[in-house]
Design a protein with these regions (language model features):
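Catalytic cores of nucleic-acid endonucleases
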Residues: 65-114
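Non-catalytic C-terminal interaction segments of nucleic acid-processing enzymes
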Residues: 115-122
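Accessory nucleic acid-recognition modules appended to NTPase machines
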Residues: 1-59
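Short C-terminal domain-edge/linker segments immediately following a structured domain
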Residues: 39-42, 93-99, 122
Length: 122
């Protein structure tokens, strides 16, 4: 991560996470599931308050948004655009349960894909 105050814990076995945690927050579980798929890349991923995960090598950021609709995703994309440009990220992927779309803002490609298509890409 790139901020000292922001620390997260992820599990390769998220069944273990469910057993250890009292609260069962689906969005956190979904985020952990996305990371499990990203492990297939065998590269380092970072996170900050704008992106769930991003690669400094491939210049791609990933945001797990299981329940946001397309309009809310587009609003969020406009808010994070300056940070994407600052980090040199030119492709941002929002992973959802079922929504799909893609659009460009100032040279940055924003892609909204469902988790099943995301996981089958690898």
């Amino acid at each position: 991560h790139d901020e000292k105050k922001l620390q997260k814990i992820y599990f390769k076995d998220f069944g273990l996470r469910n057993n250890l945690c009292i609260s069962k927050d689906f969005s956190h579980l979904f985020e952990n599931l996305v990371l499990s798929e990203l492990f297939k890349f065998k590269e380092d991923f970072f996170y900050n308050k704008y992106f769930n995960f991003y690669s400094q090598i491939s210049k791609i950021a990933y945001i797990s948004s299981p329940t946001l609709d397309i309009d809310l995703i587009k609003l969020r994309a406009k808010k994070i655009l300056p940070k994407a440009l600052e980090l040199g990220i030119f492709h941002v992927i929002f992973i959802t349960l079922s929504s799909e779309d893609s659009f460009f803002e100032q040279g940055v490609k924003f892609e909204v894909i469902s988790f099943d298509k995301f996981s089958l890409r690898f």
